Amino acid sequence: MKILVPTDGSKYAEEALYTAIELLKAKEGELFLLTVVPSLAGMDLEISAGRSADILAEFEAQGAKVINRACDIAHGEGVKVTCKGENTAPSIPDAIVDFAEKEKVDLIVIGTKGLGPSSRFRMGSVASKVVRHAPCSVYVVKKKE
């Protein structure tokens, strides 16, 4: 079984990671961890041309920290893991779905919300779009309170 866990470093993504690890311990398979650094073009930010490279580098550095931490957790739990960072994707949900299609994953395990602003009563926009467009089943994990 191939399981994909997209992670942004949020507590919800971490809960999804631990859920996927438990699933893989019960059924042998491979874990794919993915973090996606959004492109600045897709953001509603006013940035001077000179600052855009600095901001993008900052986002990429943060993405590297996120994926490295998640990979360390998975390695520590003894599961087979492939870690990938996608840089400057115009759409985070599209990057997740594209990765799932390319790697032919069997299941995506994703947190209900990420680091973005979100309402208590609606699923995060990334998770919602992944559920609608994924080529496989999607297990949406709520954070344990």
Region locations from a protein language model:
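Small/aliphatic-rich secondary-structure junction motif
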Residues: 2-51, 73-77
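Solvent-exposed polar/charged
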Residues: 22-25, 101-102, 132
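Structural beta-alpha unit
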Residues: 72-108
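Short, flexible loop segments at boundaries between secondary-structure elements
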Residues: 136-145
